[in-house]
Amino acid sequence: VISPVDSATADSRGTPSAVKRALVLLLLVGCNAEGPMREPHPVSVRDELRPTDTSSGEMWRFLPSDTVERYDAPDGGYRVHFTRLAKNAVPATDVNADGTPDLVEAVASVYVEVGAKYHGELGFRRPANDVALASNGGSDRFDIYLVDFAFSADGAFRTDACTGEKCIGYVVQENDFVGYNYPNATVATRILGSHEYFHAVQAAYDNNQGANFSEGTAVWATEHFDPTTNDFEGFLPQFLARPDRSLDTAPTGPVSGYAYGSALFFEFLSQKYGVPIVRKLLERTENGSGHPSEPADAANPRWLVQLDAILKADHQSSFAEAFHTFIYWNFFTGPAADATKSYANGAAYPAPMMTTVAAPYRVDNQRVFYAASAWFQVPAAGRATMGAQLVDDPATAEDETAGMALVIAVRRGGVNSLALPITDVKSAATFDTSGAATLVVAVVNTAREGNAGVLSKRPGLCIGSPDELSACASALRPAPDAGIPDAGVPDAGLPDSGIPDAGTPDAGTADAGIPDSGVTAVDPPKGCGCSTASPALGALLVLASALRRRYAAAN
């Protein structure tokens, strides 16, 4: 069914280009904890504006002169809004001559297919209904608006009303994809629509779980909707390039590819524990619905805490065990892939970023943030036996090896001849490295969160032959120093695996020279991700994420 929609009055201020507006917003307010935040609040007239409200100042909207039409998908609760003339026009091609442009029908069909997958097979909730909003697209159907993005992005989910942390919204997407790097508009919509629509699904549970959860689960959802796209694989290099970053902490600034690439962890969960675990996790993030085993987290749940509870209750496991296994699985990617021990499609995934060091290798304080890891590759250089161990400093009050784990592999010809997860990190674990090219060591912090504001552990690290390990461990266990405690004394900028920390404790938000992987995990401002784009900040997501997705997905 197609029906015209009345055009609104013209914007007397004029409209700068989408790109210029996005850059102006970025310069004025940025996209970090210091910028304006769109907190949950009662519905207001300003919030309820849609792209059809042409005088609204929305970045992506129809022109006052546009005649906007509606097309209702015949077999689903979706409505597509489009126009036939001027810059926002969809392609006029209508092969079946039914009066509706083919692209409009294709968009509607994709959303119907996406909805059937998400709400049928996968069992996720439908997006929150917008029937009570004054500007709701004319019905309670989920709305998709097709407008020209002028290469500022390719689409976004926008929220226009929230109750608590549950939000109502709609999707606005590129009208023709001409000049974009997708094979065609239908493929683009399959990638974009399945991703942005999943943000609407997330918003029906909780819209404030951070960029890694929001973007990671959305990319995961696209992969399960249509694994023939390479959207998922396209983001993995950016995630695996930063194994040292806490799993729930996205880089500062506009949403990055790292957040999208965190989909790998959710794919690991679904392959290891079953696909329903992601839905169960979303259900537990809803305010007031936290797992009963975590009463302190029930009112406003955090996803890592809730995942730990689900794993304990349903799988006799824990986040610590699962994360250790996740790192182990990541040893089997690329040329080292082994589907019997890791991902079904691991051959298509890159290896994590590693630091190449020479044995014997010693680090007095190897900083590893919670839910993160540090990777090393060490040439055997003729050593017949090699291994690694962690060492606690007896002068410190806290055991720096508590909650730590190792994964060690012997690689010959780029393939693991042996790889083992290790929990007894204080004992030297050694392996036959005769004829081996490389020993690969991952140091893993399996904690789900920091402890009393301290976000990392700093054990000593030794890698080498058995004799070298013994000498290293002895050197890292100094004799008592006449009663003078050295816990808390700055380390004068001595490098921890090459990263100077200037002796700054990590109980605060600063890293003292460590890139922002150690910044306290602050919930991102509303609107800094495409899942919660507000009128003030929503467009900023696309400068860092949508264009990246467009090119990564199509190559």
Range-by-range predicted roles:
Residues 24-33, 543-547:
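Hydrophobic h-region of N-terminal signal peptides that target proteins for export
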Residues 31, 528-530:
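N-terminal Sec signal peptide cleavage junction
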Residues 31-122, 396-404, 412-415, 426-446, ...:
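Zymogen propeptides/activation segments of proteases
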Residues 76-210, 217, 227-231:
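Juxtacatalytic substrate-recognition/specificity segment
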Residues 160-166, 187, 191, 206-276, ...:
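Acidic/His/Gly-enriched intrinsically disordered linker/tail segments
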Residues 290-483:
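Beta/coil-rich, acidic/histidine-enriched accessory regions frequently appended to metallopeptidases
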Residues 480-527:
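C-terminal low-complexity, Ser/Thr- and acidic/Pro-rich disordered "stalk" regions positioned immediately N-terminal
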Residues 534-551:
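A cross-kingdom C-terminal cell-surface attachment/processing module
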